[in-house]
Amino acid sequence: MAVAPLNKFLTIAVPVAPGEQTVYTAPTGSSAIVLYAQVSNVGIGETYPTVTFTHRRKSTSQRTNGNTRNNRIIKGAEIPPNDSLIIIDGRLVLERTAVAIDSIVIEGTQSGIVAISTCQYTDTTGITTVTTSVPHNFNAGDEVTMSGLAFTCASGNYGITTTIFPSPQQSFTIDSIIGSVGTSKTFVTNAGISSGIPHTYVSGGLVGPLQMEFICSILENSTT
């Protein structure tokens, strides 16, 4: 007896954080169709960020396991102030088979990105104090995105699958800065409570003003 496919519509809406982000991977036992994808310039003032949108296929076959092929749908497309770029308005099929895994990846380039030198995170309150290598030029109330901060966590079976925290697929509001605008290298935000799991900063990380937001609509087709 044939199994009727189960269809599910998804909407993914995330900020475009510094660096590369995998925003969606086709789940096991299904294929997916990207129906629509758009990036908007939500920056304050005259900003001209660019975005690259990639269809990534990773091999899982025995002979070529781990090989990756990047098919760039668009590369380095500039988005003017208060405007948006429609990347897909039709369909892009993503597969998950015994020999391949498909993902969609975005990478933004923008002004105002600075490197993070230290970060202190309190798991019980979510309060996060970030120090940058050079003055960050942020004000209290600004929205920022962060990516690539590596942490270690206390031992225990918490179901943690990554050492990167916080998630790059959300933005954060700056609660306060330490020092004066233009010379301050430290700001305070809230990255959310982590259910009593202590985090210790190791290295890395980038932070920048929120300038782009990505949204896409996906239809998943499952037979499992």
List where the protein language model places each region:
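C-terminal interaction-tip segments
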Residues: M1-A32, Y36, S40-I44, P49, ...
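Generic detection of short hydrophobic beta-strand segments and adjacent strand-loop junctions
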Residues: I12-V14, Q21-Y24, I74-I79, I87, ...
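Small/polar beta-strand repeat architecture
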Residues: Q110-F214, N221-T224
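Short linear motifs in intrinsically disordered
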Residues: S40-G43, E95-R96, D175-I177
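Intrinsically disordered, low-complexity Pro/Gly/Ser/Thr-rich segments with frequent PxxP/GP/PP motifs
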Residues: R56-T109
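Intrinsic-disorder/low-complexity, polar/charged segments enriched in Ser/Thr/Lys/Arg/Asp/Glu/Gln
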Residues: A32-Y36, S84-I86, I127-T129, T186
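Short beta-strand/loop turn elements enriched in aromatics
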Residues: I44-N70, Q110-D123
